[in-house]
Amino acid sequence: KKLKDFIKKNPTARVLTVKHAYPNLLKNNIKPWGCIVLDPRAITGKSTHNIVRKDLFATIDPQTNFFVASMTDPSVTNHLIDNGARIWGWHAYTDSLRDEDEQGHVIQNQQVKLNEDLGIPKGATLITGGTCAAMRSIGMLHTMGFRDMHLFGFDCCREEPTKEEMTETVGDIDGGETPKPKYIQVNVKDKMYWTTGELLAMAQDCEKVFGDPTLDGILSFHGEDTMVADLWKIKEQLETRPIFRDYYDK
């Protein structure tokens, strides 16, 4: 409802979404301008939210621009092509793309030497921003020139897991890792939230982005009673810029 109200008040706003929100937006008659896809896993597998990825793209609006990262699994890209999606490619930056001799070293002059075997053209723009598509969307929009971004649905938490879900674990057992609970609790502003390791990584990305001075005045957050909403409140409380309200009220 808040998103619909915002679009009504700002009819020229462009909605950029991630795959998990895409079907619900269409169901509620909100047609996204774009959907960012960053998924190196097969479309037949289950997503981080235990949804078969193919089901998320059961319906595709021909007007949606799908921004598909080059690291995306070919099965996802082929499914979108077969269903007539409008696709734009992009490269997501990770340190693993760099030449082996440069990996782990500080980047100089915002330029990196890539592994030539990857086939990424020299001078290509690489999108930074975080561990998931939602966070990369901020970097992508900023690269495109957008300077007024409103964040909806950034939560990074979930309802309390069921007894069955509480038995789920994560970890590469075959690789010698000790299995860990999939669902964990974290405390933000004296409030407990249920989350997962991947969602917690996104929350940490949010914390970094909210404190990035180059994004000052560009981001606006919409939402409450979520982990990220509390992180945004912390950001506002730490804000040190002078307030001239009293001056202008005189």
Where does each model-flagged region fall?
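Metal-ion/cofactor- or nucleotide/acyl-coenzyme-handling active-site neighborhoods
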Residues: 1-250
